[in-house]
């Protein structure tokens, strides 16, 4: 109708993103890009602090828990949160540990969105069923040992029996990977032995895999529950049963790094933390970026203004940090200063990072 104003409602969208296991380096590139653009992030307990540090400060974070035996926010309520935020027109990332479609209830969360015609995408994550054994020197398949791998949830209601066909698993002769397996480990190992598995079959329980503090206990399937109790193995853990577990001593690689087992919190400004974080990560540390410093240049800097007005009186310009270089040249740019006025100066830089920053400005 002529003269009428049509109001277009903004359409929100949900991305179901698998965060992978603990190591932030295993997050997919697409997952990282989506986190950096998110307006709302709904996340589980198993998402590492290092990954959460990638989220913009202005994004809304909604914690929904979901550890074994502890679900503070019911699944139906999580579904409603996603729907409500999308209906507000927000870019919503639903961030789940591992892969969202492997025992992650991701399908349930998307069904409600589909019913309300909310657009969504799925970004697969690296599952702990593969990454955790790999970080412990256990290949889930090996030509000389097995040609199949089978992933089973070992989660059951408190006090309930496992609904697993143990005889069928024993007949498969492949590697068995049980997720959420700590509380049900004893029932699982006993069930396999009673179903005919060799009691001397190698098995391993892997705690907090891919993190700097990961631990493992390797034994036979009959002895593993007792040895795991003695080692005080806790959730989250992955249970592996199969001949490939015998390779862990030969193929273990994470324990050889100098900072293995160390967690490091970096409090530097977010824009300066990446290089140091990468170096620590390469040495085996688990790096958590927790910026506690925010650098803001003075709106007016009378001392710098005065120095620049008498720049011909100076012979040296010395910089002690990358930030100092950036603030200085930003100050010049905003005031449209002629850089040729600096041509007589000699420049000094403390540290290679500061020197490299000067090089970016042609110095």
Locations of regions flagged by a protein language model:
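Short gly/pro/ser/thr-enriched loop/turn and capping motifs at secondary-structure boundaries
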Residues: 49-50, 68-70, 127-131, 148-151, ...
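Beta-strand->loop->alpha-helix junctions that form or flank phosphate-binding loops
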Residues: 62-65, 124, 201-210, 288-293
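Class I S-adenosyl-L-methionine
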Residues: 2-24, 29-126, 131, 230, ...
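A glycine- and small-aliphatic-rich helix-loop capping segment at beta-alpha/alpha-beta transitions
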Residues: 32, 108-120, 136-143, 194-195, ...
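Short, glycine-/small-residue-rich phosphate/pyrophosphate-handling segment
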Residues: 133, 137-155, 363
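Signature of uroporphyrinogen-III synthase
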Residues: 22, 74-78, 211-363
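A contiguous loop/helix-start segment that scaffolds small-molecule binding in enzyme catalytic cores
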Residues: 2, 11-14, 77, 87-92, ...
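Short, conserved phosphate/pyrophosphate- and ester-handling motifs at nucleotide-, phospho-/glycolipid
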Residues: 125, 181, 351
